[in-house]
Amino acid sequence: MGEKDKLHEISSKFASLGLGSLKSTPKARETTEPPPPSSQQPPSTPNGKEAASPSALKQNVRPSLNSVQQTPASIDAVASSSNVSLQSQQPLSKPVVSSKPNQTTAMPPPSNNPSRHVSSTSNKPAAVSPNPAAHHAELPSGSVPPSASVSRANSTATTTPHKAGVVSNPAAANVHVLSVAASPNPSTPSNGPAPVSTTATPSRNPVTRLQRIFSQNSVSRQNSRTGRGAAVANTEETNSTGGSETGGAANSSSTSNPSSAKWSRFTVYDDASHTHQLRPARRQEKLGKMLKDFLAGNSKKREEERIAKEAADAQHQLSLVQSWINGYGQEKLADKKDPAKVSASFVEKYGRCQEVIGRGAFGVVRIAHKVDPQNSGSETLYAVKEFRRKPAESQKKYTKRLTSEFCISSSLRHPNVIHTLDLIQDGKGDYCEVMELCSGGDLYTLIMAAGRLEPMEADCFFKQLMRGVDYLHDMGVAHRDLKPENLLLTVSGSLKITDFGNGECFRMAWEKEAHMTCGLCGSAPYIAPEEYTESEFDPRAVDVWACGVIYMAMRTGRHLWRVAKKSEDEYYSRYLMDRKNESGYEPIEMLERSRCRNTLYNILHPNPTYRLTAKQIMKSEWVRSITLCEAGNAGL
């Protein structure tokens, strides 16, 4: 039989099998054509002869197989390259059609070397890789290459050997295949198909973006409370100090006993009541251990010092000169304000300052530990805020600023307002404000750790916040800098307003009308729009606006906008447009209850004249229906 007849027999078997398995390997025709201009030589057949060229094969193969571009290799290599795809006798998947008919998708430039690439057009069956070992060398024999099924399902697949700028490893090639198939109009650079990202292109529609940003599915920490038992949120497995977080924000328990979980941040019971268990930060836990070790070491040290002092006093009891020197020194210290004496007075009243637990723009907050030996060694913790002078601030302005803040905060007595105890000047001449310690941290840290809060949890904190703001306004004080960082929490969930550095007294006790104010202060996302104008405004309305933004931050874990200026923030501009429409503003419309949504629209009214007051908010149906925790009701 001649070589032409042998080749005809091979072609007939290809046509009859329809890309089926080949049981025999006929002898390939010897070629006299010179090798292609490539450093790689064409592979040989098992008998040592060179394989037939692709052009010779194409002349005798039926037109339906023209889309399969074969590199010079033996037919056994072709059969083994499609290990499962050819042996399974499954029909090809429907090819992916390009957006333009008969258009080549991600086609690389032509090459003189037939082993450079194997590609297919968008309206033809997918290409089959001729050499499985070239791209799947790590796969065991008999396994399916990851790209085999992908190539048959996605007719736009293109396999390119390794070169600069082109992915050649199997994992990267699979991602590239999926990316090209998903893209309707992939770009084709001059050096081959460019890698296409699998990430969906963000929509330019602002409404779609708002849905994506504020949707519950986009929040990293999901809420999934099921069952009728106690809903437990934020178990102990959650790492609140950063890094990867395991588990969701909410886990369910089939029992109403919260002790069944290791630790739960927020627990809801069958009777609709709830409890907060805000664990102190790890830094505070470390501080507590350090304080215990410190006290244990100090007690031993004090005992040694007492014994040494008694021994020294025994030696000097008979010395009149030493007695006179000691008395003279005490009189001199009493005649002047010695920094050491001031410091000793502070330590005597509130203990020694320890680790820094908070930092601000012009000061730090430390923790002070006081042991009362007369009361069975009871321990009391205080928060000490150390004020620093601003750059180019005179001593007179510095003193006036601190005394003004202290006068405002020390005159307030409310469960939701921080209790300020004292203002003392330390040995360096800086003033220190002593306050009660809230070991639960601040609201900002809680939101950052949880992603977002549970609806009942956020409602409880919001009602406590509005109750404190209503009290401040009744006392004639506006805070002017409300934000989650200035809202402290106890371990049991009691919220307290702090930092009255920007506070204003808009009405004296004997006055009935409130004084208007002007000027810009606070943090940008919480500043009301009227503060950017040059006209005067009511400072109470500014506090109400900030409370609305804080509530949305608790529910969504995000800011509604960067700045409440229509010309500078597209999200705020979209809010002004959507709040007039029937569909409403998407982040607010995602909230479940209509009473909550309506109240928030009135809290965030751009015109302060029509904005709700704190007292009106407390009397609204939504806020009256909110159930507070036991700690939130304490002290009322």
Swiss-Prot record:
- What is the protein named? Serine/threonine-protein kinase hal4
InterPro entries annotated for this entry?
Kinase-like_dom_sf (IPR011009), Prot_kinase_dom (IPR000719), Protein_kinase_ATP_BS (IPR017441), Ser/Thr_kinase_AS (IPR008271)
Cell location: Cytoplasm
Task: Offer an example of a GO molecular function term for this protein.
Answer: protein serine kinase activity
Biased composition range(s): Polar residues:
56-92, 113-124, 182-226
- Keyword Phosphoprotein in the entry? The reply is yes
Which gene carries the instructions for this protein?
hal4
| Residue ranges of the region described as Disordered | 1-167, 181-261
Originating species: Schizosaccharomyces pombe (strain 972 / ATCC 24843)
EC number of the protein: 2.7.11.1
- Supply one GO CC term from the record: cytosol
- Record carries keyword Zinc: no
